[in-house]
UniProtKB/Swiss-Prot annotation:
Its EC number is 1.5.1.5, 3.5.4.9. This is Bifunctional protein FolD 2. It comes from Geobacter metallireducens (strain ATCC 53774 / DSM 7210 / GS-15). Belongs to the tetrahydrofolate dehydrogenase/cyclohydrolase family. NCBIfam families: PRK10792.1, PRK14186.1, PRK14188.1, PRK14189.1. GO terms for molecular function: methenyltetrahydrofolate cyclohydrolase activity; methylenetetrahydrofolate dehydrogenase (NADP+) activity. It catalyses: (6R)-5,10-methylene-5,6,7,8-tetrahydrofolate + NADP(+) = (6R)-5,10-methenyltetrahydrofolate + NADPH; (6R)-5,10-methenyltetrahydrofolate + H2O = (6R)-10-formyltetrahydrofolate + H(+). The gene is folD2. It comes from the Bacteria.
Length: 285
């Protein structure tokens, strides 16, 4: 049986450390501030934004939520982003995706000041990540890397297979693994013979959004499995991208769904916001 890499426990430990640092900043008159922007009424997005706001308040951060109608124009959203960019009480700006079809997501993400881009999606920060410079790292991949570190996994020389090539998870997590001296293979919908690729992996990172696509029998004995997927099956059941029951018989360590990578994503957002506040140093007094 595998060791379970408990995302909730790792996130709780990190949040306690963040809360301590927030207190220290507050003594200097700086309150880390996060602005979340939600356009429209997507139920899942509403839940995510609420969770982010609650998490901020729990750790003593300043949180502002902007909810705009689904009919909002790109120009109106850009105007809000510009105001937040110039607001000294806001250190991090998060525009919840997806956006309505009349708004170009890339245009909005590029309008966010790179020093407030706590999601790590601005091309400037993506470029810095690419060349290994200090930057805001995208929250989910960052969470994955912290979990691997906390689980005692040394990636140097390891065969890492990333299944999924999104800009949000697949590509950045592959880069981060490369920076830790892993040999990285990225698999996707056009990959030939996916099972044979996965079977070679010392570490599998699954981020495709297809329920239990990665079969347990594909996992090499003793491999580490990080399952980023969260897929709803039926009314209430949540499953990952990996066939958990079968994979956990072969893996040395595995993340569960729920309770694995999910709790880490918001925690790393809070960490990035804290770091942004430290850098700007002005704050909400």
């Amino acid at each position: 049986m595998s060791t379970i890499i408990d995302g909730k426990a790792i996130a709780a430990k990190l949040r306690a450390e963040i809360a301590t640092e927030v207190k220290i900043l507050k003594e200097k008159g700086i309150i880390p501030g996060l602005a979340t922007v939600l356009v429209g009424e997507d139920p899942a997005s509403e839940v995510y934004v609420r969770m982010k706001g609650n998490a901020c308040q729990e750790l003593g951060m300043h949180s502002v939520k902007h909810t705009l109608p689904a009919t909002t124009t790109e120009a109106e959203l850009l105007a809000l982003v510009a105001r937040l960019n110039s607001d000294p009480t806001i250190h991090g700006i998060l525009v919840q995706l997806p956006l309505p079809k009349q708004i170009n997501s890339d245009t909005i993400l590029e309008a966010i000041s790179p020093v407030k881009d706590v999601d790590g999606f601005h091309p400037y920060n993506v470029g810095r990540l690419m060349v290994g410079k200090p930057t805001f790292q995208p929250c989910t991949p960052y969470g994955v890397m912290v979990m691997l570190r906390e689980a005692g996994v040394d990636l140097a020389g390891k065969e890492v297979v990333v299944v999924g090539r999104s800009n949000i998870v697949g590509k950045p997590v592959a880069l981060m693994c490369l920076q830790q001296h892993a040999t990285v293979t990225i698999c996707h919908s056009k990959t030939r013979d996916l099972p044979s690729k996965v079977k070679e992996a010392d570490v599998v990172i699954a981020a495709v959004g297809v329920p239990e696509m990665i079969k347990g029998e594909w996992i090499k004995e003793g491999a580490v499995v990080i399952d980023v997927g969260v897929n709803r099956v039926g009314e209430k059941k949540l499953v990952g991208d990996v066939e958990f029951a079968a994979a956990s018989q072969r893996a040395s360590a595995i993340t569960p769904v729920p309770g694995g990578v999910g709790p880490m994503t918001i925690t790393m957002l809070l960490y990035n916001t804290l770091e942004a506040a430290k850098k700007t140093g002005e704050g909400n007094r």
